[in-house]
Regions:
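Ribonuclease/tRNase effector modules and their secretory precursors
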Residues: 1-88
Length: 88
């Protein structure tokens, strides 16, 4: 998978949510991850949410879209409710 992100957006995401995009992309390698469509944010383009764990053990939600064979993403830690669903 080829990932891309805006450097400034990456800084903002890390400052706001404490998740770097380098860590966020690790979720795509989690064998237990699950992906759903994000209808609330799929107005101009389809966005998906992947729920998974990074190599450091943090459980993350990564929102992503594919543009020209590259993935653009945003990430945050799972809420307690999301974490419970992921663990089941």
């Amino acid at each position: 998978m080829d990932f891309e992100w805006d450097t400034e957006k990456a800084r903002i995401n890390e400052r706001k949510y404490g998740v770097s995009f380098f860590e966020a992309r690790e979720v795509f390698g989690d064998e237990l991850s699950s992906t759903i469509r994000d209808p609330d944010h799929s107005v101009e383009e389809e966005r998906l949410l992947i729920f998974g764990q990074s190599s450091s053990g943090r459980r993350l939600v990564v929102s992503y879209t594919e543009r020209e064979s590259r993935f653009r993403l945003s990430a945050r830690e799972m809420t307690p409710r999301e974490r419970k669903a992921y663990e089941q």
